[in-house]
Amino acid sequence: MGTIVLKMTAEQISVLQKDLASYATATKNPYAFFSAKVDGTSVIAYTSGKVTFQGAKPEILASRFGYQAEPKQSPDGQNLALIGSDEVGNGSYFGGLAVVASLVTPADHAFLKSLGVDDSKNLNDSKIRQIAPLLEEKIPHKALLLSPRKYNEVVGDGKAHNAVSVKVALHNQAIFLLLQSGAKPDKIVIDAFISEKNYQKYLKNERNHFEFPITLEEKAEGKYLAVAVSSIIARNLFLKNLDKLSQEVGYTLPSGAGAKSDQVAAKLLQAYGDQALQTTAKYHFANTKKAYQRLK
């Protein structure tokens, strides 16, 4: 929970009141004359002329009314042209595996921040569906989607890949294609899902290679705008694929790998047989066995 306090003129507060009128809430504070709540951020205007913004990300709303964040020291490479790569779908039973690599330069930062691109994990799916097309249009990127059918052909015992090596292959290919398109980064960062040593081990099996060094960094999505952009575009690609598969089978396929996925998988088995899971799900997940057990 963060708090931002602004000293505002009567005119500025009047503008704030008008803008947030539809979000107004009641306040019992004797020193406050206006309060509102917008997307989880509480706003209170005091008779002293001070206005507080309190919530998980108060700076987003406060910036609309004159707040300017103190410059923070950026992570190494943040102020460089940076390729960031991330994947979505690897933890979901249903749906494909989406990997996106994006090139972000310092000139893009203001645009990205105006959209609220920080860490896509703080954005709901509705917001992601709204933002992703804007990012796809403006930010150079390469997006790959491995469908469940293709995933099941290449991932598993005795097949070309395991669940980790297939991600190495997709990240490598997305970055390779972006570099081939003319992207000239100062740094390449992947949201870490494996050690550097093992990444390089799996990389030896790939056909396409590039000389530019990569950095595997944990929680990179929250540190680098390029990785956050890739995460948002990848999430949207994954959701669109999940929608398409749901329409094809006539059942709403959930994201994730919990009990709901077991239930839907059992219904698909009952309605269409094993082939339905081969074309909509990552078959090697434990959910497949649990779905069969539900039919006994």
Swiss-Prot record:
The lineage of its organism: Bacteria, Bacillati, Bacillota, Bacilli, Lactobacillales. A divalent metal cation binds at D86, E87, D191. It catalyses: Endonucleolytic cleavage to 5'-phosphomonoester. PROSITE patterns: RNASE_H_2 (PS51975). Gene3D superfamilies: Ribonuclease H-like superfamily/Ribonuclease H, TATA-Binding Protein. CDD domains: RNase_HII_bacteria_HIII_like, RNAse_HIII_N. Endonuclease that specifically degrades the RNA of RNA-DNA hybrids. Its EC number is 3.1.26.4. The keyword Nuclease applies. This is Ribonuclease HIII. GO terms for molecular function: magnesium ion binding; RNA binding; RNA-DNA hybrid ribonuclease activity. It is an enzyme of class 3 (hydrolase). Belongs to the RNase HII family. RnhC subfamily. One of its GO terms (biological process) is mismatch repair. InterPro entries: RNase_HII/HIII (IPR001352), RNase_HII/HIII_dom (IPR024567), RNase_HIII (IPR004641), RNase_HIII_N (IPR024568), RNaseH-like_sf (IPR012337), RNaseH_sf (IPR036397), TBP_dom_sf (IPR012295). Keywords: Cytoplasm, Endonuclease, Hydrolase, Magnesium, Metal-binding, Nuclease. The keyword Iron-sulfur does not apply. Residues 80-296 form the RNase H type-2 domain. Manganese or magnesium. Binds 1 divalent metal ion per monomer in the absence of substrate. May bind a second metal ion after substrate binding. It is found in: Cytoplasm. Its cofactor is Mn(2+); Mg(2+). GO terms for cellular component: cytoplasm; ribonuclease H2 complex.
